[in-house]
Regions:
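N-terminal glycine-/charge-rich "phosphate-binding" loop or analogous flexible N-terminal tail
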Residues: 1-45
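Short, well-ordered beta-strand segments
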Residues: 4-7, 67, 90, 139
């Protein structure tokens, strides 16, 4: 039994199709940076990674699963035909928690050291004082799992 997945993403790593084939023997995996280029292949695809625009979805005869390439799937991601279909949509909820949290702390430290002032200068001159972090309070506001 073959399984076809289309990777609809500019960020898709060129090594992913081979990794998918190794993990799922007989799988067919193809990368499309522009979903419009996948019009012929979507008709036989079982799954898609990324965003499947309505005009592409309309041609998807066998599609059973869409794995969104992001965590927050707002209303713009869904459209009537997708909502009314039996296609399962999964997201990356929780996948980026550690990465996002680490990134947020890195920016916090960069701003505390006033990197936004020094970086454009491309040289280090005494400028605005640094924020001394011990004793400071940080409030992290987030509605998703990365902000918890």
């Amino acid at each position: 039994m073959s399984f076809t997945i289309l990777l609809l993403s500019l960020e898709a790593d060129p090594s992913w199709p081979e990794k998918i084939r190794q993990a799922v023997p007989g799988a067919i995996a193809k990368i499309f940076a522009d979903p419009k280029d996948a019009l012929a292949d979507i008709e036989t695809a079982d799954a898609a990674y990324g965003t499947v625009p309505p005009e592409l979805f309309a041609r998807a005869k066998k599609l059973r699963w869409i794995c969104a390439s992001r965590a927050g799937l707002g209303g713009a991601y869904f459209y009537d035909a997708l909502v009314k279909s039996d296609v399962v949509v999964t997201g990356m909820h929780g996948s980026y928690n550690e990465h996002l949290s680490t990134h947020a702390v890195a920016f916090l430290l960069a701003f505390a050291r006033r990197f936004e002032h020094y970086l454009p200068q491309k040289r280090w001159e005494r400028g605005p004082g640094m924020i001394h972090l011990p004793g400071q309070t940080v409030l992290i506001v987030g509605v998703g799992s990365a902000g918890q």
